[in-house]
Amino acid sequence: MNKGKEILLGHGERIRIMSAFSISYPTLRRALRFETDTELARKIRHTAISEYGGMERAN
């Protein structure tokens, strides 16, 4: 489902999100790169932007 977008986050923020959602790095990476569009992926993207300062970038 890659729309040519991604959410940019620092390494520390990625670690905190993985811990908060109890997910693996590949799950986080696929969500932030818009490769998946599940309910969990949408929650991860929303949290990354609203709580961890993530920036959405179009490729």
Task: Locate each region found by the language model.
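Short helix->loop/beta-hairpin flanking segments within DNA-binding domains
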Residues: 1-4
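Short amphipathic helical patch at the helix-1/turn junction of helix-turn-helix
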Residues: 8-9, 19
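Short Lys/Arg-enriched helix C-cap and helix-to-coil transition segments
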Residues: 9, 39-59
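Residue-level signal for the short linker/turn that defines the boundary of a DNA-recognition helix
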Residues: 11-12, 23
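DNA-recognition alpha helix
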Residues: 13-17, 51
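Short alpha-helical "recognition helix" segments of helix-turn-helix
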Residues: 16-21, 28
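Recognition helix of helix-turn-helix/homeodomain-like DNA-binding domains
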Residues: 25-36
